[in-house]
Amino acid sequence: MNYKNPTHLQAAILDWAGTVVDFGSFAPTQIFVEAFAEFDVEVSIEEARGPMGMGKWDHIRTLCDQPQIAERYRKVFGRTPTDDDVTAIYQRFMPLQIEKIAVHSALIPGALETLTGLRQNGLKIGSCSGYPKVVMDKVVELAAKNGYVADHVVATDETPNGRPWPAQALANVIALGIDDVAACVKVDDTVPGILEGRRAGMWTVALVCSGNALGLTYEGYRALDPNTLEAERKRIHAMFEGSRPHYLIDTINELPGVITDINQRLARGEMPQAV
C-alpha cells in the first residue's frame, strides 16, 4: 500500500463560542469575572479574555499565575493561589456558567446557512470546546433548538489534555471516520484552538472578528468605522501570528471561500504541515 495525499477536505472541526455561537464570546468571559468576585478578587474582562480557548480549570490557573491577580488574591487570603484554590474558584464557576449559558446562546448571524452549505458539499462537521461536558451538554441543547447540530462534539474533559494539545481535534477525526488529518480544517477564534489544529496536522482558520480577540457584540462589530475595524484586524492578526494559522477571516461566513482554496491546494499536492 502506498500513501496518497488527500485531494479534498472531508471535515471541518469547529469551535463553539465565538465561532458558531455567542458572537464576541461573552458567556465564559463574564462568568470568570463573577466567579473571582465571589472570592473578593477583582478580575477585569480584558484579563479574563487572555487565556481563552483553554479548558476552564487551566484558564483559571493561568489567570491565578498572572502576578497582578496573584497579588490581589494574596491581599485577601494571605497567600497566592494554590491548585486547591483554583479548584474552589472552578467549582464556583461551573454552576454560574451553566445557569447563564442561555443568555449568550444565539447562533452567529449567517452561521447556520454557511454550515448547511458546507454539508451540502460533503463536509462532516466536528466540534470541540474549552467547556467541560456538563456545560457543553447545555450549549449543544440550546444550539439544537436554533437549528445547529454538529456531527460530533468533544468537551475539554473528555480527553486527557485540552487545548492547545491536539487531543480534542483528533478525537473528532476518529469519531467522524476521517482517513487523513490533512483532510480536515480546524476553525477557531483563539490561539490555543489554532495551536490545537496545527498540532493535529490540520489546516487552520483563525476567526478575527466574531470571537474573543475583538470581544464585541455583533452590533458593536457592525458599528465600527472602517479605520477602527482595520486597526483591530491588524492587532488581532499580530496576536495570532505565533500560532501560524493558514487563514485569517472575519467570521465563519467567509469559510466557504477558504474551503474552496484549500481544496485547490490539496489537489495540487499541498499539505497543511508543509506551510
From Swiss-Prot:
Positions annotated to bind Mg(2+): D15, A17, D189
Gene Ontology process terms (BP): DNA repair; organic phosphonate catabolic process
GO MF entries: magnesium ion binding; phosphoglycolate phosphatase activity; phosphonoacetaldehyde hydrolase activity
Enzyme class: hydrolase
Catalytic residues in the record: D15 (nucleophile), K56 (schiff-base intermediate with substrate)
InterPro entries on file: HAD-like_hydrolase_sf, HAD-like_sf, HAD-SF_hydro_IA, HAD_sf, PGP-like_dom2, Phosphonoacetald_hydro
Co-factor binding comment: Binds 1 Mg(2+) ion per subunit.
Keyword terms, alphabetized: Hydrolase, Magnesium, Metal-binding, Schiff base
Pfam families, sorted: Hydrolase (PF00702)
Keyword match Magnesium: yes
Keyword Cell inner membrane included in the entry's annotation: no
Catalytic activity field: phosphonoacetaldehyde + H2O = acetaldehyde + phosphate + H(+)
GO cellular component, one term: cytosol
Cofactor(s) this protein cannot do without: Mg(2+)
EC number: 3.11.1.1
SUPFAM superfamilies given in the database record: HAD-like
Cross-referenced HAMAP family: PhnX
Protein family membership: Belongs to the HAD-like hydrolase superfamily. PhnX family.
Role played: Involved in phosphonate degradation.
Subunit structure: Homodimer.
Protein name: Phosphonoacetaldehyde hydrolase
Organism: Pseudomonas putida (Arthrobacter siderocapsulatus)
Organism taxonomic ancestry: Bacteria, Pseudomonadati, Pseudomonadota, Gammaproteobacteria, Pseudomonadales
